[in-house]
């Protein structure tokens, strides 16, 4: 198979979808790998390293899309790439379609096969290609939240972990999945007073057993969240419904309960966000303010630490890339039901129910 890896062009997206080691593995199996010039540079991989692994370098993004049977990316194609995706081409990346109608319709019109990292499942219903980036995003969300609590950044001017004789900041984590788990661990490690909320009692029991003493658990309800907000300094929103839009757990009216200078970090923003007042931001302009509350809503948080996140991502994706290249997407998905759940759009038809539901469009069975 001919595999193409374009350079990511989303704002400050520094990751790359394939390392030289991954390229070598594919070339060894008889596949042809094309890498766009400097695609791996920000992740620490030179064109020379890819060439040494047997990959070929192409000068432009158009060249890569034009020649490839399978495009492997990190983030969804942006508007400038829509016309480059062509009929019958397999695109394997994070899509998050349910929050992006223009992207969804563009990919339907392209006639491509869209296989989304975020909806591939393990037999136990965990999400193997979302987990590594959720781990990174969870940890970084606390780092970024702590930074924007500083006075020069417009925050309240408090240190997350406090100091002896001074209370630490209070952190509320909404959602006890992988992002929430990692957020709570990071905040607790920095010395904050942490509460993690979830609707699953079994999950709360598990978290209560494994978390440090400065992490408390709370059943997630509108009432309980409202009770927490007046004393909370930093909220991490990490709610996930696979493939679907995230629910709004904090409304605009609820912002009035918070003190000015508090920070909301919406890690769920690539699925539409879990705060009513959220809208996507970038690493170049990461924050905005609503009613005196700072919102951090960067949709590609791990892109800021590409040398960590590229390796974490490609460790997870490479086995699937190999399977797709070796067998073709139809046979690979027929043999691996978890991989088949990654299929969101096939040649103009939506085949993932949550995406169809988000836009009131028909959902077709996978043939």
Where do the protein language model's features map onto the residues?
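Glycine/serine-rich phosphate-binding loop and adjoining beta1-alpha1 elements at the start
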Residues: 2, 8, 79-169, 298-300
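An N-terminal-biased, well-structured beta-alpha scaffold segment characteristic
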Residues: 2-110
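Glycine-rich phosphate/diphosphate-binding loop of Rossmann-like nucleotide-binding domains
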Residues: 6-42, 152-240, 287
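Generic hydrophobic/aromatic pocket-lining and core-packing "Φ" positions
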Residues: 23, 47, 104, 142, ...
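Short glycine-/small-residue-rich Rossmann-like dinucleotide-binding loops
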Residues: 69, 75-76, 95-96, 221, ...
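Residue-level detector of alpha-helix initiation sites
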Residues: 76, 136, 177-178
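Adenosine-phosphate binding glycine-rich loop
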Residues: 118-159, 269, 274-367
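Rossmann-like adenosine-cofactor binding region
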Residues: 209-292
């Amino acid at each position: 198979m001919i595999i193409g890896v374009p350079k990511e062009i989303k704002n400050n997206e520094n990751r790359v979808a394939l390392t030289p080691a991954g390229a070598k593995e594919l070339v060894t199996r008889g596949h042809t790998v094309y890498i766009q010039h400097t695609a791996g540079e920000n992740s620490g991989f030179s064109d020379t390293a890819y060439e040494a692994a047997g990959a070929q370098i192409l000068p432009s993004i158009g060249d890569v899309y034009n020649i490839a049977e399978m495009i492997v990316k990190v983030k969804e194609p942006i508007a400038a790439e829509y016309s480059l995706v062509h009929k019958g081409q397999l695109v394997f990346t994070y899509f998050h379609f349910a929050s992006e109608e223009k992207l969804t319709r563009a990919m339907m019109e392209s006639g491509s096969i869209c296989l989304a990292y975020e909806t591939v499942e393990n037999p136990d219903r965990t999400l193997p290609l979302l987990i590594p980036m959720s781990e990174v995003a969870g940890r970084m969300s606390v780092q970024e939240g702590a930074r924007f609590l500083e006075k020069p950044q417009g925050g309240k001017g408090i240190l997350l972990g406090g100091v002896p004789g001074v209370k630490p900041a209070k952190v509320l984590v909404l959602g006890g999945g992988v992002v929430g788990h990692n957020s709570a661990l990071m905040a607790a490690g920095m010395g904050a007073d942490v509460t993690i909320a979830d609707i699953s009692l079994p999950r709360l029991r598990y978290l209560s057993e494994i978390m440090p003493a400065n992490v408390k658990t709370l059943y997630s309800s509108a009432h309980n969240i409202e009770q927490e907000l007046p004393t909370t300094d930093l909220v991490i929103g990490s709610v996930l419904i696979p493939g679907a839009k995230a629910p709004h757990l904090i409304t605009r009216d609820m912002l009035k309960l918070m003190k000015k200078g508090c920070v909301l970090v919406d890690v769920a923003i690539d699925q539409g966000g879990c705060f009513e007042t959220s809208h996507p931001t970038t690493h170049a302009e990461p924050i905005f303010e609503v009613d005196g509350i700072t919102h951090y809503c960067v949709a590609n948080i791990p892109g800021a630490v590409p040398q960590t996140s590229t390796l974490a991502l490609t460790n997870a994706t490479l086995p699937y890339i190999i399977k797709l290249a070796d067998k073709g997407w139809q046979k690979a998905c027929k043999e691996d039901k978890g991989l088949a759940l990654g299929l969101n759009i096939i040649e103009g038809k939506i085949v993932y129910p949550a995406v169809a539901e988000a836009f009131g469009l028909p959902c077709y069975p996978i043939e």
